[in-house]
Every structure is written in structure tokens, then in C-alpha cells.
Amino acid sequence: MEEISLMNDYLKIKKYYINHDQLVSHRFLCNSKECVMSNECCCKIFDVEISPREMQRIISIMDVISNYCSNLKTGKYYRNVFEEEDQRYTIDKKANEYCVFSYFDKSGDLKCAVHSAALEIHKDPYYYKPFVCSIWPVTFFKDMSKRTFIDLDTESHVPCIKKKAMNEKTIDLELLNIILIIMGKDIVSLRNFFKQHNFPR
């Protein structure tokens, strides 16, 4: 089992430093209708930057994606919805400031066309979706020593991130699964640790 220790507010496992206090004290439950009503939606307030590889993956299923977003196609041609700068690309937004790949389904829920397209062709959505979208509201950065610090975005005031009661001291499974995407599925000790213990805050 991987060695786990607590350093200030951070849980240390290998080269990863997880902001335990932030992640334990908040709950994440995606509710697009609530976010749209509040005008604070991740699909609107953030600019999504992707790598060339991520862009190519999206382009490879653009024919399916365009079934969900008619604005992606002009005649028989697909629009260029990526802005390039220094070998990084930013996904365009619509006139309403939402991501160009966002759409509303029949029930009025805001959805990601990339995610929906991947499911339609029976592929893993997280292979095609931008990495920053897959892990949000969890964020991370690497310092000069190649240590990875994992935090929660608590600054954007998006309504799907809620403060938990003070007596709740376990991390939500939804957030834990996102952390495992960053760390890699082979690191199972973190999942087992949270299942077996109420880790002290």
C-alpha cells in the first residue's frame, strides 16, 4: 500500500499533495439547470484550453458531435472552432458565451456534445473530452520539484460546489474519482483509505 501522510492541509501520497481540507469540506453535484439559472456555469465562465492532441481527438468525431450542435457545420464543411496560440488551442464560445460544444437536451439540461458523441459511438467520453473539463472542479499544478498539488476550485461560486456541514469529514466519491483520474487508476490505496477511515481534518 502507498504511504499516506498528512502535511498541514495536504494529504501526501507519493508525489501528490491533495488539499484534504478543501475536498473534505465541499460537495460537488453537477446540476446544469441550477448553474444556468444562476448565470455561473463552468461551460460559460471559463475559457477551455486544449493541447494539439486533444484537438485532434475532438476533430476525429466531429461528424457525430455536429449532430448535437448544428452551429458546428456550414453546408458540408465544419467550422474551425479552435483559436491557436503558441501550440495551444482555445475552444470558441457561442454568442451567448457558452462553450461552442454545449447544447440543451429535450429536458432542458445543458450537455456537452463531445461527451454525448463519445457515448453514442460507445467510446470513453474522457478520452475525447478536454482534460480540464473531465477533472473540473478539481484543479492541479506541478511545481519546479515535479510535485503535483491537487486543489478544489472554490473561487468561481458555481452552485454545484456546496459547503458541507462541519461534522461531515469524508470525501465525496465524485471528487475522489476525479482525483484518481489525475493520479492514475493504478493508485488504489487512496480510494481504499477513504473507504476505511474518516480521515481527520
Give the residues covered by each predicted segment.
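Short loop/turn segments that flank or connect secondary-structure elements
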Residues: 1-201
